[in-house]
């Protein structure tokens, strides 16, 4: 076991060992993933740690409940709602910060380059303009890539990682303050650097980090930031705040608080309740109105007007008053929308397939090399993107006549769109009174380009739209996955909007459907491609409706997204699920396949257990913790017929056997307890039965054998009984002897007990053992001490630890005959980390963990099942 690299929080021994792999940090493994040389598919890694979403109702927790009166309960709720509001406000301010500096850097870059292009168009020095554009873009991308080297998990959008976190997987470094700083600064440099990425996706990750860190009032990265805030010191509470923060991020990005709430439910959170719904919606509203308030005041000088609800504004869709035949959409258009949904699904599947191949190539050929290679790859993508943008605008663009409402302003043309939002059109390389349609799309911020496609009628030729779509599609696919913070929402929307606008132009010019509204088709195209890539339906429908502020678009958007999802699902998964799979994360889907019910809990559990006794010596606990990597241990006692002989003279064995007897509940014993509590007594016969069961036992002496087993590098388990000394010649019955199950205790709890000296001497009773409060047990959360950092010289190895007050005495359990679908539903819906399998007489026979419920593991077990039939 010393060579094991990690485990999926399970209590099995053999399944946690890994082969030798190259040395990488947990953060690098998280973002880079691992590949298998012989197999093309990437299986879930077993060294991911799960989160404790199940509440541990032990003695310290019950003591808290005893002191929790109505007033404290109300105060706790007030604090929780206040924290939720603060998360929303802070997420909105993060969005404001990113948007402000992205606009600042983008305006600086385009201002310098446009002035140079205007001057060099006449002097013939366009190469100088290209060098200036390259200088800006390469510098910004270089800074973004350096930030990812500082914190590798800051790369990408962060949505796959947050999805895994909310699913119950502990992703290293995903919600650190350092990750937030690298993400925020990195994404503004990525967008300002001209890469085909968006800032809206990383807002979800940023909001999640704010939600995770703000309620803790401390930081792992900056350890001096600590206020000893006593609340919300558990994974269960943090999960709810991360859900709220992620929703606040997308609400700030799109100005869609209801859609953001649904997004957190549909794509993110695996565990949900009614109270969380209100808190997530309130947090989303807080983020939306915070961002709206400050953006409206800064941009328009109209504080309190609330004119800009999100980072991405789609504007108002309406037909011209002079065009009486125009309609936003008609029933006849639904057929075109369905076809566009099919094409969007095909394009999305193609995008995902290409990006998956690129990601695998990077994992095999880029990531194993020195970190500088990842920076060079990012610079290469930036270089190619800049060259394509500049050359395409100069060579492939068409000079089109300005409309009468257009006017020249500082080398660009200002055009008032129907949504009352000013968007600039570019006159690059074109004579007076004309503009370059390709440059208008490439030399504008992506949000402005989307507005151009949504609201400008007849300003782009079909050839320009087709070329722009192909170039943007390929470059966006290549860009997603490089070592910079990047989002995928806006690139997918812009690429899809060009596709929809192309369809509208073809229908108008070549089929003669003059009544159609081009903006509607552009919106449907954007929805089709985005839905084909990310495969979301409900939340994306509401987000787009809220962004357009047009409820009549609800039906066509929903149908388009459904068709795009069905079409794409026929070929592959959504882009986020693909990247989750590439990282080997044991993500649990919503449900298992029907055929998995051919398996039972006994088929998938791990029977080879590492366990502890209710009373165990420090020497044994330290050895177990240092020689295994499991994150929880069953608390058990052994079933023997001659227990009285072994109790003589040994306090440790006596305490364990007494605990076992006291934990056995009988109907007669319960009736006696109830009768005594009512000042009445049962019959003498019933008393005799109970007295016989709880008869006192005499203790005996016994030798601790754990150190001998540890020296032999073989630890089946420290056996307390002298007639069964550890031996490699044990029979199967001896190795898997019956064990009565009493509860579960976590590794973090055991280490905390050892660090704080919670133990008692063999010459004393267990009542003399110091007691820890709930606050003391959770004080080191979320970074509990490591057993290897423990100073063993401060511990007496012969002292005994009573773990019973701190274990979870009533975890969820299943019987060996429980069908896999029932095991899966219980594990997933209750947010479990470990699921003991207990037989009909209360003996633990195995443990089910997250790894045992992954699709790949179940498929392997199903194949074995078919082979044994």
UniProtKB/Swiss-Prot annotation:
Record: residues binding ATP: 630-632, 849-852
PROSITE patterns referenced in this protein's UniProt entry, alphabetically: CBS
Name of the protein described by the UniProt record: H(+)/Cl(-) exchange transporter 6
Catalytic activity: 2 chloride(in) + H(+)(out) = 2 chloride(out) + H(+)(in)
Compositional bias of kind Polar residues: 677-686
Intramembrane annotation, residue ranges: 159-166, 241-253, 257-265, 519-533, 534-536, 537-548, 549-552
Transmembrane segments: 81-113, 128-150, 176-194, 200-217, 277-294, 335-364, 371-392, 462-481, 487-511, 553-571
Intervals of motif Selectivity filter part_2: 198-202
GO cellular component: a single term: lysosomal membrane
GO BP annotation list: chloride transport
Site annotation Mediates proton transfer from the protein to the inner aqueous phase: residues: 267
Renumbered ranges of motif Selectivity filter part_1: 156-160
Residues listed as glycosylation sites in the UniProt record: 410, 422, 432
CDD domains on file: CBS_pair_voltage-gated_CLC_euk_bac (cd04591), ClC_6_like (cd03685)
Top-rank taxon: Eukaryota
Swiss-Prot/TrEMBL keywords: Antiport, ATP-binding, CBS domain, Chloride, Endosome, Glycoprotein, Ion transport, Membrane, Nucleotide-binding, Phosphoprotein, Repeat, Transmembrane, Transmembrane helix, Transport
Pfam families according to UniProt: CBS, Voltage_CLC
Tagged with keyword Membrane: yes
Alphabetized GO MF terms: antiporter activity; ATP binding; voltage-gated chloride channel activity
UniProt PTM: N-glycosylated on several asparagine residues.
Primary residence: membrane
Binding site for chloride: 157, 489, 576
